[in-house]
């Protein structure tokens, strides 16, 4: 099962690719301005110079391409070329229900088995206890 942001990324990256732009520039990030939108993409800015188009035109093309997608409740191109996105509540509910059906609740299995060693170091009772003794365990010195 794909994580939520990967699903959004796939849809937006496909739109960029279908319009003839670099697929990887369609990467979506969580918005640092939640008052404006939930997610944002600045791929139009990255493609503007290479394709010799204004970033706003590219952003508007991508928004038009994505307008029919039921994943988004709100899509808008804003100056200088950002694409602001809000996710449809029904899509989010469907995603959570899909997670509930999965026995691992959407958490993917580890691809590589790793061994983790946890050392619970204790104070040496033969020496006086002070802050310097705790650094050996905290930093990982032997």
State where each predicted segment sits.
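Charged, compositionally biased N-terminal leader segments and the immediate start
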Residues: 1-28
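Short, charge-patterned binding micro-sites
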Residues: 27-42, 78, 82-83
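Residue-level signal for inorganic ion chemistry
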Residues: 38, 58, 85, 130
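Short, small/acidic-rich helices and loops at N termini and domain boundaries
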Residues: 35, 39-57
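Conserved alpha/beta enzyme-core scaffolds, especially Rossmann-like or related mixed alpha/beta domains
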Residues: 21-30, 76-79, 115-121
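N-terminal catalytic cores of NTP/NDP-binding nucleotidyl/phosphoryl-transfer enzymes
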Residues: 42-45, 49-50, 94-142
